[in-house]
Amino acid sequence: MNWKKETVEIKKRRKLAKAQGGEEAIKIQHEKGRLTLRERINILLDKDSFHEQGEIAGGVEVDSDGKLESLTPANFILGFGKINNKQVVVGGEDFTVKGGSPNAAGLRKSVYTEELALKFKVPLIRLHEGGGGSVAGPGKKSGGYGGDPVFSKSRFKSVAETLREIPVASAALGPVAGMPAARFVASHFRVMTKETAQILVAGPAVVERAFGKKMTKEELGGSEIHKLNGVTDNVADSEEDAFLQIKSFLSYLPQNIYELSEKIDCNDPIDRKEEELLSIIPKDRKRSYEMRDIVKLVFDKDSFFEMTKFFGKGIITGFARINGFPVAIFANDSNFYAGSMSAEGAQKTSRFIRLCDTFRIPIVSLVDEPGFLIGPDAERAGTILHGTEAVLATTESKVPWSTIMIRKSFGVAAAAHYGPDGYVLAWPSAESGPLPLEGGVAVAFKKEIASAKNPEAKRKELEEKMAKNQSPFPRAESFSVHEIIDPRETRKYIALWAERIQSQLKASLMNR
């Protein structure tokens, strides 16, 4: 007597589970230009590193003798795997089984995915494609929706806990609604595919029933909608591109809040000087320039990874490396609103700073901040509310900051760019004060300008006079900045700072 019969049964069930929703469902998935979940996992993870959990979970049908006739696998697949030889947990809805809408086993596995990542303190990656609950779900057979037991904990508890302890990255790779959509946004990094993904509170049929308006999934929640409202951080050209972006994001973060991000080998000399930096800021204060070019010239070559580019366009956020050390980049983009902080830009700022604070990633702020965005639209958007929240996020930040005054630094909004006890450098092009010259002079010298024989000439005269007071040299003389530097020296100064703060970062882990 042995257990061969039972092992054959195990093998049979595994084979049925691997078949997912069947050949026809897989064919339809491919015809829509989308991979199956198992294909996605294989592409995302290091080769042969996936160790599935709950492989044969699902609903079964047996004959009168108790022999297995069929198995409908759980429409959620999860397990351990490795990315660049580092352990992660990955999970996602299997759209080939019931369109990814959770069956009983799938629901349990989806919750367990977060608990597993939390237990082992490793990054969590979600690959979303599926709907939420269905009116044809559990209540259809039981005659009603009894709900969860009174002692059950909220499914959102583990969702919230993951965000406090481990990196969470989510990809939307098809239509995503209900609880999967909520999980998608409850992530540190969110990416959706350009043409195949939609994030929806409710689909077209529900919207038409409620509003009498016919709309496609793409019109309701495609990437063109959500890249502008901040629901997704980034948009990917393909599923493979989405996986590469997730890998890039995770490369800057530690495994959990109890570790620090890793330094990598760097062949880019810290004393590299780029002549272009000497002329990159126009002498004409009203002209814009490319802040991203500064980032690329100062930090390690090809190391900049941008997040949330199309939401809050006046603000730039992302990660880079300096001499191999990972740092966060927080900057202004003078091409949009002259770099001023809008309500959306402030929301983007707050979220990004808190992400860096959670995982102890030092922040480099490149400042060209004329102040909060003004005007009726800005007031309606609650700019002062969200802007103040951004300032408070900076004030409460516990990571090391280095602030480089590139050009403007004005108003309350400027306070969002200077972390506690930060290392402050200024370029010769820097200017700072309570208000920008253009508005400040017009207000402070209103009567004097109006009574002048040539008001325009008087205004220009006053602006030139006041500009000297906003120069960085008086600040350097009074030790209000650590150094005023040649822009070409920026890389070296920041690289030396990044090395100095490592002991500070290690000590901060003791307070966890």
Label each residue range with its predicted role:
Residues M1-R512:
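Ligand-binding clefts of soluble mixed alpha/beta catalytic domains
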